[in-house]
Regions:
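Short, Lys/Arg-enriched N-terminal segments with co-localized hydrophobic residues
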Residues: 2, 7-14, 18-36
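Active-site-proximal helix-loop elements at catalytic-domain edges
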Residues: 5, 15-18, 68-73, 322
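Sec-dependent N-terminal signal peptides of Gram-positive bacterial secreted proteins and lipoproteins
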Residues: 37-60
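Flexible propeptides and autoinhibitory/regulatory segments associated with cysteine proteases
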Residues: 60-129, 220, 224, 403
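Non-catalytic, conformational "gating/processing" segments within enzyme and secreted inhibitor domains
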Residues: 62-67, 71, 100, 138-305, ...
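Short acidic/histidine-centered micro-motifs embedded in hydrophobic/aromatic stretches
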Residues: 131-132, 174
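Internal alpha/beta scaffold segment
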Residues: 303-325
């Protein structure tokens, strides 16, 4: 059963019994609290969106929102598979470059795209990618993760509707480039990535083909990732990853204000109020959790300090590993609907991956020509309202022939 989150789902809502008024409840995200200017920083991470206890979906925002795919019971140890700290650092770097904008970022989508090229990397290039990803066998993690993802596309018998969580990968190969047989096999076996031959000299048709794949795998939420000016005479290969999540809320409904209220310094928006399921707190931040179907959850994080902050300063890992202080909390937050486009090449170079973009890169395990990464682009979109959430990410890694020596 497919749920359309643009329609109200009152018939599906299961109202749980609320605690007595004299029990511990906390008002959370009051509109009089500062909300980090008018910014929402979304860290949609190992959304596959990233926690350290299992492969996840995470979203962090400046009131940080975090959606988590809780798969600890699936015996996948994310601590040993994905470098959470690198993802937090990268999110903070993206925020620095977009100080006046809401942002959303998916570490998992990026990691899967980088994980694919790591399959054909050697020497220093391989070491740099392994260091960033936090494992020398990302392919094994990818296989397990994709199997876990599939188990969440089922109807939740408690609430009568289905969450949707899907991941896809693809290889787009310029005519005349020959992929190494082992690389192509590894990409298909571990990432379910099929290779399609295109004529990159026909830039418009190449982009249309890739964008059609992008549109299909995000249910239309992200209709395109490539533009013709992203390709040139040296472009030889494009690797893409997509992530898509959709679900309604599984517990108490959100009530929406009739009038818009101030959000941050300038923006006005409608707010939603509800009962959250858990309340967390550390020295730097407070957080609430609210469930979707199939034990997926959203976590909103509010920093205690005024002014600018980084995700690193909030000790998100410690916060989310802690036991909740209360099992109910009054929560209030704005509706969210925005998208982000982030060119990640410069940021990745600054945090340790400069080799993959240089003529010193060794991707001899990928193709019969010497190639390096020329561009890493990610697009994300989030729609969150009283009925549920839709979130998507697409990452495209473009590779070129190296310049002649």
């Amino acid at each position: 059963m497919k749920i359309n989150i643009t329609e109200r789902r009152n018939k599906y809502v299961k109202i749980k019994q609320k605690l007595a008024e004299n029990l511990c409840k906390k008002d959370f995200i009051d509109r009089t609290r500062r909300l980090y200017m008018n910014k929402i920083k979304l860290f949609a991470g190992a959304l596959t969106f990233m926690t350290t206890m299992a492969p996840p979906i995470h979203v962090y925002a400046a009131t940080a929102s975090h959606a988590e795919l809780n798969a600890a019971e699936k015996n996948i140890d994310l601590d040993k598979s994905v470098n959470l700290q690198n993802s937090i650092n990268l999110t903070d770097e993206i925020a620095k470059e977009n100080q006046d904008s809401n942002i959303m970022f998916s570490p998992t989508s990026l990691n899967f795209a980088l994980g694919m090229i790591a399959e054909g990397a050697k020497g220093e290039t391989k070491n740099a990618l392994n260091e960033y990803l936090g494992t020398d066998d990302f392919a094994a993690y990818a296989r397990k993760y994709m199997n876990v993802i599939k188990s969440y596309n089922t109807e939740d018998e408690n609430y009568g509707y289905t969450s949707k969580l899907k991941i896809a990968d693809a290889l787009w190969v310029n005519r005349g480039l020959t992929l190494q047989e082992q690389f192509q096999k590894n990409a298909e076996d571990n990432f379910e990535a099929k290779a399609e031959i295109l004529d990159f000299s026909d830039k418009e048709n190449t982009c249309n083909t890739i964008n059609a794949w992008c549109n299909e795998n995000t249910d239309g939420l992200i209709p395109e990732i490539m533009k013709p000016d992203m390709l040139n005479e040296n472009s030889e290969l494009c690797l893409t990853n997509s992530l898509y999540f959709e679900s309604g809320w599984s517990q108490d409904p959100w009530d929406v204000s009739d009038e818009k209220e101030k959000f941050g310094d300038n923006e006005e928006t409608k707010y939603m109020t509800s009962i959250g399921d858990n309340y967390y707190e550390n020295d730097a931040a407070t957080a609430f959790e609210k469930y979707y179907a199939n034990n997926l959850s959203f976590i909103g994080i509010l920093p205690k300090a005024e002014g600018d902050f980084t995700l690193d300063e909030l000790d998100i890992e410690g916060l989310l590993k802690s036991e909740p202080e209360y099992d109910e909390v009054n929560c209030k937050m704005p509706k969210l609907n925005f998208e982000t486009t982030a060119e990640l090449s410069d940021i990745l170079s600054r945090i340790g991956l400069e080799n993959v973009f240089s003529d010193d890169a060794d991707f001899s395990g990928i193709a019969d020509k010497a190639v390096h990464v020329s561009s890493v682009l990610q697009k994300t979109k989030l729609e969150l309202d009283e009925n549920g959430t839709k979130a998507a990410a697409v990452t495209a890694v473009t590779m070129e022939c190296m310049s002649a020596m």
